[in-house]
């Protein structure tokens, strides 16, 4: 029923001709259920606006803060592991394979890692550690006390790193 209603909505919004993927995405974006894995890809792609909408959607849908944190922190840890392997002399493709990074994330990592500094990744790892405490109820100076606000700050820090790598 929901899919049928979306098709009817698309017919009303765009009555003539073939639809592009962008038109379909724009029409259904606000009703789409979000998941943490798509959030992860959007963060790694540096899509700041989309990331903010997805975080708002995940919060509204009642997603657990710790699960969202896990997804973000896992990406940060993986970036750091692959970067460390590269620093140890491993070629990027081998480091990605060894860390089980493939599919869409592989391409995103290939774009990010050559330009990401060790210091930036260390700062992100520290931020992820702080947010881990916040989503579990700890209060940290200079950080939002609300878990979702802290998650947004962490996601935007990672977005800035990935945007700089473009």
What is each residue range found by the language model?
Residues 1-41, 133-141, 150-166:
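Non-catalytic interfacial helical region
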Residues 3, 69, 121, 148-151:
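Hydrophobic packing residues in well-ordered alpha-helices of helical domains and bundles
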Residues 15-123, 163:
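Small-residue-rich helix-loop
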Residues 128:
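Short, basic/aromatic recognition patches that contact phosphate-bearing ligands
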Residues 145:
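Short active-site loop/helix that positions an aromatic residue
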């Amino acid at each position: 029923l929901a899919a049928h209603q979306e098709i009817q909505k698309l017919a009303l919004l765009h009555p003539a001709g073939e639809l592009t993927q962008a038109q379909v995405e724009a029409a259904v974006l606000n009703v789409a259920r979000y998941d943490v894995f798509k959030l992860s890809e959007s963060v790694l792609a540096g899509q700041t606006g989309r990331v903010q909408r997805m975080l708002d959607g995940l919060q509204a849908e009642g997603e657990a803060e710790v699960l969202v944190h896990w997804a973000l922190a896992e990406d940060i840890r993986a970036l750091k592991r692959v970067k460390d392997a590269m620093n140890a002399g491993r070629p990027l493709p081998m480091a990605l394979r060894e860390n089980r990074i493939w599919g869409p994330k592989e391409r995103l990592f290939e774009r990010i890692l050559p330009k990401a500094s060790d210091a930036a990744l260390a700062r992100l790892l520290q931020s992820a550690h702080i947010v881990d405490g916040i989503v579990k109820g700890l209060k940290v100076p200079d950080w939002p006390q609300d878990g979702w606000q802290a998650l947004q700050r962490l996601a935007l820090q990672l977005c800035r790193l990935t945007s700089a790598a473009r």
